[in-house]
Amino acid sequence: MNMNEFKGVIEGLLFASGDEGVTAKQLSKILDIGLDTVEHILEELRFEYEREDRGLMIIQSNNIFHLATKPEHSSYFKRLIDSPRTSKMSQAALETLAIIAYRQPITRAEIDEIRGVRSERPVQTLITRNLIEETGRKDTVGRPVLFQTSKEFLTFFGLATLDDLPPLPENIDPDKEEREADLFFERFQDEV
């Protein structure tokens, strides 16, 4: 690979790493190139983003590099967040919503444990759509935030109370459960 190709891959890795970011050392290991080369490419990318009229920038904090939006464009990002949503919710968001609905109040760590993957983004999506809300903190180490469904959740799904949620099945056949879940998600994808 030449330097421009490495630059493109590093840019993609910065994007893919999201909020967690990535260290130069990690990039060096992933790309199997020297740390000096990675740092040089990061500096070039940073310069290009700063020099050109671009919407993104590379920030570094605690030796972790992040791809971020430029603060001077924040009013446009706020408009996007505040605009009515017509997009569909992801399956991850729907799964997370179901877990919260049936297990509330619940912490994000508990949601992660049930799903087997991190749920930070689905939780944020549900908060943004006002389907869930923070309801306090759990009385345990670290005092994590507890989440519950909101009044908008009840309204959106046409429920008077949480007691109107359909009961969870007791004897679960995993194959049948997956087929039914797929049908459920297909039905609500059109509505959400």
Swiss-Prot record:
GO terms for cellular component: cytoplasm. Pfam families: SMC_ScpB (PF04079). Homodimer. Homodimerization may be required to stabilize the binding of ScpA to the Smc head domains. Component of a cohesin-like complex composed of ScpA, ScpB and the Smc homodimer, in which ScpA and ScpB bind to the head domain of Smc. The presence of the three proteins is required for the association of the complex with DNA. Participates in chromosomal partition during cell division. May act via the formation of a condensin-like complex containing Smc and ScpA that pull DNA away from mid-cell into both cell halves. GO terms for biological process: cell division; chromosome separation; DNA replication. This is Segregation and condensation protein B. It comes from the Bacteria. InterPro entries: ScpB_csome_segregation (IPR005234), WH-like_DNA-bd_sf (IPR036388), WH_DNA-bd_sf (IPR036390). Keywords: Cell cycle, Cell division, Chromosome partition, Cytoplasm. Belongs to the ScpB family. It is found in: Cytoplasm.
